Swiss-Prot record:
Pfam families (alphabetical): DNA_ligase_aden, DNA_ligase_OB
Protein name stated in the entry: DNA ligase B
UniProt KW keywords: DNA damage, DNA repair, DNA replication, Ligase, NAD
EC number: 6.5.1.2
Protein's job: Catalyzes the formation of phosphodiester linkages between 5'-phosphoryl and 3'-hydroxyl groups in double-stranded DNA using NAD as a coenzyme and as the energy source for the reaction.
GO MF term list: DNA ligase (NAD+) activity
Gene transcribed to yield this protein: ligB
Annotated active site: 125 (n6-amp-lysine intermediate)
Length: 557
């Protein structure tokens, strides 16, 4: 069942999702602006989805956006007349209201819901479009969209094209079924393929005035309730199978307890199915008669959704990390989110060009996924804050392969990256001398160039806050080993832009005196690399550093 069709149910007392996030520290004017813009965006999405059958955003992002709206409204006491289903409401009454379903937030919530219940069943939560199917004398005569649960749109014009749906029952029954129209998929594994926009395809087709037979043949039906059916779920499923609705029994399992529910949830998440799903439905065998059903979440059904494939995250700040070569990487600092089993508070945008393209500012809401199930990745900007906070962006012209050889406020990050590379395993391989140590030494004024550490004494180190006697001894030992590393390791550590297989010889002077033609003669060195090598070796800061290393009697200099 589509999540958007259940939104009004979440406003009922006791059904709102728990939200333990702190309230933003915003003045009233900004709070009103943020809520107003969020309402406009949601209204725009609702209108496109319900009138045109076009989903502008994934269901899970829509759901999280609704939750964020409720959070802000609760924080700032900003009630609204927002009606998510205003454009979904049709003119035709359902013979039996669609109840919707309450969502269980996490495993403890599922365990609490199951506690003490008997006769439980579990089914896949098919990701499609909810409908009522009205049969008269065994013939399908009316097809109604869920609408607002009470009034739906008449989609009966599509019945002749829906060849995969039972249009004539084997018995002349006058009855109503409720179910999900879904887009038929071959061997669809939800954990791997995600939703595949399956629900959006069906919603878009049904919003049309007319379907072709080919389009209609792609639509299947999963009957999930028979309001006037037998009293027990087992009997209902058996009779549904006899009537031709075989998937209902095929994908329904009687369970006892949480462990069984968790097993089937994982099984259907990772097993090939003929439709997309977004969780499982837990269903109690006993239920009241259909005359008492209302368009609200009932006590006898609940949904346990799959983990989000995308999470909505609010940007707290933007930091621009500058690497050793001057590459600028924007890092979004996020309000922490949970995605799968990971807590994420930072995500890289990869390049300055991508940040410029997306124009992300603090306060914006972005969609975050896990690339390869491990690496956080920004998929899109979902909501832009009406307050476009200024962002201080490093100038790419100030940071490049030959910039920042000394400590300064503008060069702090790139210079620290140079030190970390020099002492790392690609350079001098000084154990215990990482970014934190270099930061301490630079902040205390003990290191301002790439060679200053060669002059540090025990007394110098003990003057640095956070460095005691034992640590000072370990650092001196690491520095001593680093000093004695071979010439080639020093060159790699300083960032010589040569191919990995290049053998530099044993003398800096000979290396620095090479011309472009000599570099071009080296295997793997083209025109661009030759120019980089020439510029590196002739740069005044690099030459000054080489002279200092020669004064320290470093091998090769």
């Amino acid at each position: 069942m589509s999540l958007r069709l259940l939104i009004p149910l979440l406003f009922l007392p006791g059904l709102a999702l728990a939200d333990h996030r702190p309230c933003p520290d915003w003045p009233a004017q900004r709070a009103r602006a943020e809520v107003s813009q969020l309402l406009k965006t949601l209204s725009h999405w609702d209108d496109h989805y319900h009138r045109q059958g076009v989903a502008l955003v994934a269901d899970e992002l829509y759901d999280q956006s609704r939750q964020h709206l409720r959070h802000l409204q609760g924080c700032f006491d900003l009630a609204s007349n927002d009606a998510p289903l205003a454009t979904a409401r049709g003119q035709v009454p359902h013979p039996v209201p669609h109840t919707g379903v309450d969502k269980l937030r996490d495993e403890p919530a599922v365990q609490r819901w199951l506690q003490g219940r008997q006769g439980m069943w579990i089914q896949p939560k098919v990701d499609g479009v909810a409908v009522s199917l009205v049969y008269q004398q065994g013939q399908l005569t009316q097809l109604l969209s869920r609408g607002d649960g009470v009034l739906g749109h008449d989609w009966s014009r599509h019945i002749p094209q829906l060849g995969r749906i039972v249009r004539q029952l084997p018995q002349p029954l006058d009855t109503v079924f409720q179910g999900e129209l879904y887009w038929r998929l071959a061997d669809h594994v939800q954990a791997e393929a995600g939703s595949a926009n399956a629900r959006g395809i069906v919603a878009g087709l049904l919003a049309r005035k007319q379907l072709s037979d080919e389009q209609g043949s792609g639509i299947g039906l999963f009957v999930w309730d028979w309001p006037a059916g037998p009293g027990s779920q087992a009997e209902r499923l058996a009779q549904l199978t006899a009537l031709g609705f075989i998937d209902s029994q095929r994908f329904s399992v009687a369970i006892e307890g949480f462990d069984a529910a968790a097993h089937w949830r994982q099984h259907w998440y990772r097993t090939a199915l003929p439709f997309a799903t977004d969780g499982v439905i837990l269903r109690q065998d006993a239920r009241p008669p259909a005359q008492r059903w209302r368009a609200q979440a009932p006590y006898w059904i609940a949904a346990w959704k799959y983990p989000f494939s995308q999470a909505l995250a609010q940007v707290r700040d933007i930091h621009f990390r500058i690497g050793r070569t001057g590459r600028i990487t924007p890092l979004l600092q996020l309000e922490p989110i949970q995605l799968d089993d990971r807590r994420i508070s930072q995500v890289s945008l990869g390049s300055l060009a991508r940040w410029t393209q997306l124009d992300i500012r603090p306060g914006d809401q972005v969609a975050v996924s896990l690339a390869g199930l491990t690496i956080p990745r920004v998929e899109s900007v979902v909501h832009r804050s009406p307050l476009r906070a200024p962002v201080l962006v490093p100038d790419p012209a100030d940071h490049h392969l030959l910039s920042c050889w000394q400590a300064s406020p503008a060069c702090q990050e790139q210079f620290l990256a140079r030190l970390a590379w020099l002492g790392g395993n690609k350079g001098l391989d000084m154990a215990g001398v990482g970014s934190g140590v270099w930061h301490q030494l630079v902040e205390s004024g003990k290191v301002a160039t790439l060679s200053d550490w060669l002059e540090l004494t025990r007394e110098d180190l003990l003057e640095v806050p956070g460095i005691a006697q034992a640590r000072a001894e370990r650092l001196l030992q690491a520095f001593s080993l680093g000093r004695r590393q071979p010439f080639e390791r020093w060159l790699r550590g300083l960032g010589l832009p040569a191919p990995s297989h290049f053998s530099p010889g044993a003398d800096w002077s000979a290396l620095a005196s090479r011309n472009i033609e000599q570099w071009l003669a080296e295997p793997g060195v083209g025109a661009v690399r030759a120019a980089q090598l020439q510029a590196f070796l002739s740069h005044e800061q690099v030459q000054a550093l080489a002279r200092r290393l020669r004064a320290h009697e470093i091998e090769g200099f």
